[in-house]
Amino acid sequence: MPSLAKWLGDTLESVMASKFIQVKLTGKELVAPAVVKLYFEGNLQGIPFHEGNAVAFRVNQIDYRNYTPSYWDDSGCEIIVHLHSNGPGSRFFEQIQPGAQLKMLIPRGRKMFDNSFATHTVIFDETGLGYATSVFEASSKNGQEFYAFGNVPGPVNNIRFPFNATNAKNGQYHLLEQDFQAFLDRYWIAAKQGAFYMVGNGKLVQITRNVLRSRGIQRQQLFTYTYWIEGRKGL
């Protein structure tokens, strides 16, 4: 969601009160450098959730930030958040502690999972760990194949799925493409007829999509969602 004047945000929460759920932060766990998993409890019964949907929190008087849940059921959800010093959402969740009561805007937005495919491959960075987890959960539930390629800094702990990792820092696009090509070479026979989901940094999405198109992957197999772009206001 965009930034809103304080009075408009207050009005929104009043007029759309049924769209906001009261949740309690019950746990906070570091799973990777500058990446935390947040555990929320609340009455989510009857609220639909689809992989790729986002919830939103008001992180200060004027800013809302969207996050894709990694897990969702009737009694609570999990969200994986990338923390950095440049964004209001990052500052908010860096400071908040278990026990805090929050208003959460219910899931909405894109549906980024097509269960008509038998194989699902997710390409992501540290901002897409939550989404990748949700696709793993959905594909496992359906008995479908799942593969993952992540550009993340350092080791990742307590994530429910295995993935091939690279650590191509800003500007190291040749390394990102090289490692992604090697990943595809390893899993190509199994993955090439399936769906490919690319989320996170705009450059990661662009590079990996171009690689897949050059290998003959059709547009209807590709699903993309750019979460952030270098130089833009942070998460």
Q: Where are each of the predicted segments found?
A:
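Extended, composition-driven regions rather than compact fold-specific motifs
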Residues: 1-235
